[in-house]
Amino acid sequence: MVVDSSALNVENDWKPERTLVLLGRTGNGKSATGNSILGKTMFQSKARGKFITKECKLHKSKLPNGLTINVIDTPGLFSASSTTDFTIREIVRCLLLAKGGIDAVLLVFSLRNRLTEEEQSTLRTLKILFGSQIVDYIIVVFTNEDALECGETLDDYLEDCPEFQEILEECDDRKVLFDNSYNAPVSKKDRQVHDLLNLVEQISKKNNGKSYMADLSHELRENEATIKEKQKQIEEMKGWSSKQEISQMKKELEKSHNEMLEGIKEKISNQLKESLEDVKEQLAKAQAEREETEKKMNEIQKLSSDEIRRLREQLNKAEKETASLRTELNKKCTVL
């Protein structure tokens, strides 16, 4: 059974579960990957981009072994077109959806698309926003297996992609290849999900079973427990309190709950704003350094071109002089 959840519905679920967050550029196949993991089409996904994820959404599925898989799909959070307010709002929404903490961050890349500058900076951005330990929870997911040459493996493809090698090195080479096409064999899709969940369990063991953002999860659960206790007290008062009093208490409780959530969102937002300023500053600095390097390389190339042109002109001049001397010499030989 697959159910949906809202961003502000924080429930205490005793059953074992794993929460996975999909991150990546729009068009890389995040939603399709989420559907493959869930085993059902829950996230809207169209190759032509008719349906684009505009906000974080969560769907869940229970495996035969009883494990609940929560999958959070996100819009393109770190694209150049995303505003700071949009990025902060959706990150907060994502964190509230991940009520029990995040067990793995799935960084999704498409083998069909060229790696953009924003994608190359994704790890740096994540580390600035959430701390360097975030890399301990990242799994790199490659989509569009059909983009590989006949007989070519993912490792073969990556040999010629140093930018991907750098990302994988930071993530302990945790990677998986997904074929999200409709005609992919069920056995193949099952194997992909199995390989992914094995990596999730490796991450769990490496981090001693602690989910990422567990502190936020603990705060949410504590506040939720307080709310539930007050709800219980209100129910017990129904026998000797008027309907008007009960209604007023429920309104006050709802207000308290909303204020609690707003307080948490504001705290996260303030932290993210400061971090995003650092991200922008560092990315701008890196961009300036890259442009300066390119400028110097162009100058060197221009100097080299000018030097080659000068040498070529000297060579042509020397050849002409040699030809002229040879002509004069031939004339003298003829006279003699």
UniProtKB/Swiss-Prot annotation:
Positions of GTP binding: 24-32, 45, 180
Stretches of the chain forming a coiled coil according to its record: 265-328
Tissues in which the UniProt entry reports expression: Expressed in pollen grains.
Positions of the UniProt region annotated as G5: 179-181
Ranges of residues in domain AIG1-type G: 15-221
InterPro entries tied to this protein: G_AIG1 (IPR006703), GIMA/IAN/Toc (IPR045058), P-loop_NTPase (IPR027417)
Region (G1): 24-31
Family matches, as Pfam families: AIG1 (PF04548)
An example Gene Ontology molecular-function term: GTP binding
Annotated segments matching region G3: 73-76
UniProt KW Flavoprotein keyword: no
Positions of region (G2): 51-55
PANTHER family for the chain: GTPASE, IMAP FAMILY MEMBER-RELATED (PTHR10903), IMMUNE-ASSOCIATED NUCLEOTIDE-BINDING PROTEIN 11-RELATED (PTHR10903:SF122)
Family indicated by similarity: Belongs to the TRAFAC class TrmE-Era-EngA-EngB-Septin-like GTPase superfamily. AIG1/Toc34/Toc159-like paraseptin GTPase family. IAN subfamily.
Protein's recorded name: Immune-associated nucleotide-binding protein 13
Native source species: Arabidopsis thaliana
